[in-house]
């Protein structure tokens, strides 16, 4: 099936990535406890990536960069902790439950607990501002236009929530809206049941939608995408990851299918380095670097059980929920 374009034209300028990542050697430095600065216990060179690691809280499953510091959802502890760019632990909030998905904006950080349908709002010092319910089984959240946007595939909705935690609008979106991302002007949500991407502007108006292919023939193989695992917008493309078939689909900003890139199967996480898409595969313990045009630059075996990835402009950051570490990936030209 050929993907259809936008039914109503959406802005084509999408969120820009930051930083350019080109890595050439690896050194793994892991501290012996949650504090930074532990003794070097691993030094295994692996070509093409430079890395350092620090111990963090139990079962880190989500990481974001808010422009100044890193925030990690430590699901096993029921905490959210901020970290400096040298790996130092800064502040910790006990939010309870199982925080897993994070978003930031307007000086706040929000932690989504999909198990109990709640979001905890934190200030920049990790003080709990408020906690509120957002849906039945919320799956993703982003912050845009002074509002938090939360997708809920069970309820088939996207909620627009004010900074004060009040429900400003409830939009019914398709059947099962799940993975969510944003551009500077709109929120984009993908529905794996209807194979649809829907755009919502900051006023809460649905401004357009398109369908992505339900079957793609490449060579002798036919690919059926299945349920989206992750979704990310970059300056010239939309990327939808399908962990079940081990593929990342590239779409133009207007919604036209422009290719598939093979990656390992299983849970996947995405980040943009400035000119490459970084795909973390949990089951394969790899990072696959993909160019802006969809070709594989290189695949790196990083070991462990990586769960999420973020980028700060100079470094990539990956969490590992088995080793309970935060791993920093640094471009070689930036290493002293």
Over which residues does each language-model region extend?
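Predominantly soluble domains enriched in secretory-pathway, periplasmic, or organellar proteins
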Residues: 5, 9, 13, 17, ...
């Amino acid at each position: 099936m050929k993907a259809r374009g936008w039914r109503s034209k959406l802005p084509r300028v999408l969120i820009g990535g930051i930083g350019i990542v080109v890595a050439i050697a690896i050194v793994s430095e892991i501290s012996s406890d949650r504090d930074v600065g532990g003794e070097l216990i691993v030094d295994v060179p692996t070509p093409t990536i430079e890395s350092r690691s620090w111990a963090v809280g139990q079962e880190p499953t989500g990481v974001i960069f808010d422009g100044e510091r890193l925030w990690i959802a430590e699901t096993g502890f029921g905490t959210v902790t901020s970290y400096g760019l040298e790996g130092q632990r800064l502040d910790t909030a006990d939010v309870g439950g199982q925080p897993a998905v994070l978003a930031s904006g307007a000086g706040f950080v929000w932690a989504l607990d999909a198990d109990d349908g709640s979001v905890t709002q934190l200030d920049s010092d990790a003080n709990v501002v408020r906690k509120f319910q957002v849906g039945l089984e919320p799956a993703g959240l982003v912050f845009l236009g002074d509002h938090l946007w939360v997708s809920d595939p069970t309820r088939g909705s996207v909620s627009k929530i004010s900074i004060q935690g009040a429900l400003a609008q409830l939009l019914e979106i398709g059947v099962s809206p799940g993975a969510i991302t944003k551009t500077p002007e709109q929120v984009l949500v993908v529905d794996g049941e209807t194979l649809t991407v829907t755009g919502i502007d900051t006023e809460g108006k649905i401004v357009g939608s398109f369908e992505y292919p339900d079957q793609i023939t490449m060579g002798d193989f036919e690919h059926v995408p299945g349920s989206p695992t992750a979704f990310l917008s970059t300056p010239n493309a939309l990327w939808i990851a399908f962990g079940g078939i081990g593929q990342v689909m590239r779409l133009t900003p207007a919604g036209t299918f422009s290719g598939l890139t093979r990656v390992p199967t299983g849970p996947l996480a995405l980040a943009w380095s400035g000119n490459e898409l970084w795909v973390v595969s949990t089951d394969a313990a790899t990072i696959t670097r993909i160019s802006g045009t969809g070709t594989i630059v290189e695949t790196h075996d990083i070991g462990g059980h990586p769960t999420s990835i973020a980028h700060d402009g100079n470094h990539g950051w990956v969490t590992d929920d088995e080793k309970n570490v935060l791993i920093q990936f640094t471009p070689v030209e930036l290493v002293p």
